[in-house]
Amino acid sequence: MDYQTIEETAAKWGITSRQVRTYCAKGRIAGATFDGKAWLIPANAIKPERKSRAMPPQKSILAILEAERAAKLTGGIYHRLQIDFAYNSNHIEGSRLTHDQTRWIFETRTVGEVGADMPIDDIVETANHFRAVDTIIATAKAALTENYIKRLHAILKGGTTDSRKDWFAVGDYKRLENTVGDMDTAKPAKVKAEMARLLAWYGKTAHTFEDVAAFHAKFEAIHPFQDGNGRVGRLVMFKECLKHGITPFIVTEQMRRFYYMGLHEWQGRLQSPTRLLDTFRAGQDAFSAMLRHYGHTVAADAADARDGR
């Protein structure tokens, strides 16, 4: 069977790539498959009929997570999110914990099944990530401020070996210079001003999916903390998606290469957002599929509405 890309199908049907991606994620294109990186669509696929705009009220993703967390529900989307998010975000940064070990820590609040040679920070930061996600669910509607971002860093790095180093500021901006690969980041003396400028810019945006992604690229370029910038940055994106009704996403280990390439391309000379946005959209597709797996149908986000989905 011959297959087409999202872009080829969009051109053929006269709609946006985002609409085609949504049709795929919602299972509305027969034979469409996701290979872990992109959707493959049969060349003879039929364009789905537009649905009526009259839809019953639906719960937001934030409301679902709040309810499942409050009920201490196991085996639901909240449970799955906590494990998958902590495992992938920490693993991207070098954690040695497996997915099963991460699940064990979340479900039992013990380390009984974790090997004796496992770095203690991998365990502590995993437990801290669970707390950070709980904090975000409880405070998602709060304004995004410097203090809020610092609070996430304090939660993530609290009790780690870094927290006992004189030069490491837990919950505060870096004191020493750091780099990301071959790219320079903001000097410690300039971080506060750079963060204030970033938040002022973001506050004037429409807080769309693209704005959240742009904030992340700019935040990672500043790299305001001594360590933990990637994880804090991804937590911030999660919070802002929940706040503004945008389908959230998890950057998985499988997406790692495309994620870092996307950041580099956006932050570099060409300032191209395409790869990073596509990577995040693939994550949204996976999250939407996970929601359907657990029987949830949620209200479309603002970007979906603009595309007429």
Which residues does each predicted region cover?
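Short, basic, alpha-helical segments at the C-terminal edge of helix-turn-helix-like DNA-binding modules
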Residues: 38-39
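FIC/Doc superfamily catalytic core
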Residues: 1-13, 17-22, 26-28, 34, ...
